[in-house]
UniProtKB/Swiss-Prot annotation:
This is NADH-ubiquinone oxidoreductase chain 3. It is an enzyme of class 7 (translocase). Gene3D superfamilies: NADH:ubiquinone/plastoquinone oxidoreductase, chain 3. It catalyses: a ubiquinone + NADH + 5 H(+)(in) = a ubiquinol + NAD(+) + 4 H(+)(out). GO terms for molecular function: NADH dehydrogenase (ubiquinone) activity. The lineage of its organism: Eukaryota, Fungi, Dikarya, Basidiomycota, Ustilaginomycotina.
Length: 143
């Protein structure tokens, strides 16, 4: 029997056996605290679902996703580093330059600030000269 065939047969069978063993042997003690929804550190919302919350959570999630995908795409390149041609190297350099420019832009617009006046949630226009994404005014201090 082929090794891959063995894995395709053995792993699902083992998973089903372990799931049924868990259902049969696990202690079931339902509690009101255990069955309540947990919503990212907030109290569960009952009734009205239109409560205000900070949009920064979504912004951080999207930024995390973008840079997590960057790491995911970097790993195969790192594994084949010695087999990559000059063309592949320059494609990778351009990839990192685009991500670096994006990070500098996010930092400049204040997307990474939560409690500062420079937060991007204030809907400042990037076209304004005093709100340029790459420069701060003289009255603002950089961290």
């Amino acid at each position: 029997m082929n090794t891959i065939t063995l894995f395709f047969l053995f792993i699902p069978i083992l998973a089903v056996i372990l799931l049924f063993a868990n259902l049969l042997l696990a202690v079931h003690r339902p509690d009101s605290e255990k069955v309540t929804p947990y919503e990212c550190g907030f109290s569960p919302v009952y009734g009205q679902t239109r409560n205000p919350f900070s949009i920064q959570f979504y912004l951080v999630g999207i930024l995390f996703l973008v840079f997590d995908i960057e790491i995911l795409l970097t790993y195969p390149y790192a594994m084949n580093l010695y087999q990559t041609s000059t063309y592949g190297f320059w494609i990778f350099v351009i990839f990192f330059l685009v991500l670096t420019v994006g990070f500098v832009y996010e930092f400049g617009t204040g997307a990474l600030y939560f409690t500062d006046k420079r937060s991007s949630i204030q809907n400042t226009k990037i076209s304004d000269s005093k709100h340029s994404p790459f420069f701060w005014s003289k009255s603002e201090k950089r961290l």
